[in-house]
Swiss-Prot record:
Species of provenance: Brachyspira hyodysenteriae (strain ATCC 49526 / WA1)
Amino-acid positions noted as binding substrate in the UniProt annotation, renumbered to this chain: 8-15, 21-22, 60, 87-90, 98, 114-115, 183-184
Catalyses which reaction(s): (2R)-2-phosphoglycerate = (2R)-3-phosphoglycerate
Active site: 9, 87
One GO molecular-function entry: phosphoglycerate mutase activity
UniProt similarity note: Belongs to the phosphoglycerate mutase family. BPG-dependent PGAM subfamily.
SMART domains on file: PGAM (SM00855)
Name of the featured protein: 2,3-bisphosphoglycerate-dependent phosphoglycerate mutase
Signal sequence extent: none
Amino acid sequence: MTKVVLIRHGESVWNKENLFTGWADVTLSEKGIEEAKAGGAELKKAGFTFDKAYTSTLTRAIKTLNLVLEEMGLLWIPVDKCWQLNERHYGALQGLNKSQTAEKYGEDQVKIWRRSYDTPPPALEKSDERYPGHDPRYKNLSEKELPLTECLKDTVARVVPFWENVILPDIKAGKKIIIAAHGNSLRALVKYLDNISDADITELNIPTGMPLVYELDDNFKAVNKQYLGDPEAVKKAMEAVANQGKKK
């Protein structure tokens, strides 16, 4: 049985402030640093090791991965930083407070923007400083690849081919892989691995800093998954993520 580990970055400073983050590049909070270290400790305790790691081009995921690998004594393994694993782009919502946005537009609308499969938030203008085309890390991407906004369906459209064409060949070659990414890029991957319907994906929330272990069968299809750590703590963390888009 093949195993692959997914981990959402630890709490970021914008998670702490309950802001829509998307492709905005913010760092980890103190709590997020501790979450990442704890995730690494859980993996080490459970006897995991890795040959290669994948993460996004965003600081919060890269730092999380480094902290996990440091806890495990694995900072030396190769790491690929890939924009395809970035968080979904939240468009014109990036930088706005989720609770205040719920006050303005209503909780139902914010839940649709946050959790629906195919309804994107309002788009950015290309002149907006938040447009990824202004960021040097994306200078090699085509205009078509640079989002003005994204729904989860758009995120699936970049994450799943990356899994199939880049990550899965490494797994098939026998490499032990860890992926450190984001709430929605991981929701996109989990949707694919677990064959979750467009409707049911609305209720899926992924907690920060908690390793999610997938078991794959001989055909590299997911047959089991489990969070490492205390089940009650996992449940509470999922509920906290779900409540972020509600009015105060």
